[in-house]
Amino acid sequence: MNLQDHAGDIIRKARAMTDIPVETAAQAAGLTPDELAGLEETGVAPRKVNFKAVAQLVGVDGSKLEAVAGGWLPAARDLGLWRELRVVTTASQGMAVNCYLVWDEISREAALFDTGWDADPLFRLIQENDLQLRHLFITHSHHDHIAGVAAVKERFPKLRIHSGSRGAPADQRILANAFIHLGSLRLTNRETPGHSEDGLTYIIGNWPEDTPYVAIVGDALFAGSIGRGNLSWDLARQKVREQILSLPSDTLICPGHGPVTTVAEEKEHNPFF
């Protein structure tokens, strides 16, 4: 799976974060403004880009940005190590989005994290594995992540829904840092606003055979990038640093878009950190 953001996306986000005009960034990059606009749109430039200079200007790491431009990807992960963890990717309107299904191997109790565009692949997975869907956890309320909520609620009317949205019904608003058990698995949450006001990261532990933690982060963090700072760029970056990158280095990061990664890889390779 390709990265959610190419090098041009990263430059565009970093420019927005620092309020650097395209003309100024283009000069640092050794491009014309039109060429930089093309790079930001497609990830491709007609000539060599001075990534380190433009990175220094917009406040990201130049060596890491060069690596992304050169094709860096996080190492492939065998999700079979976690046994009862599945990623389901659906696409619509030119956008692919990930959601995640987790269950306890003994009780078959399951939890869904976001729904993506289409719930039908989830229904098949639940049926194939003879699961009892108990919980739906929402990372944030952007439409691509919750488009299937109505269908899931209709299929599983007793489902408990958990959300950080202020607009959610009172019985759906999850308490910060609350613990929930799913069979032997233990789930908690951390507030990660910035991309959205209601952003939450869910952390799952106590996997069989001491397999590392899993952090389902929504759009707070991508492999090699971060989500757009719709609420606040500074807050988005701060919360990722404090609430996600503070987790153990082998924690599996499961983002809303793009490939899975780890805390260690993002510390080493993400240009924003």
Model segments located where?
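DNA major-groove recognition helix of helix-turn-helix/homeodomain DNA-binding modules
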Residues: 30, 49-64
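Conserved beta-strand hairpin/beta-sheet module of binuclear metal-dependent hydrolase folds
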Residues: 77-128, 200-217, 224
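Core dinuclear metal-dependent hydrolase active-site scaffold
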Residues: 101, 179-209
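Metallo-beta-lactamase
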Residues: 196-273
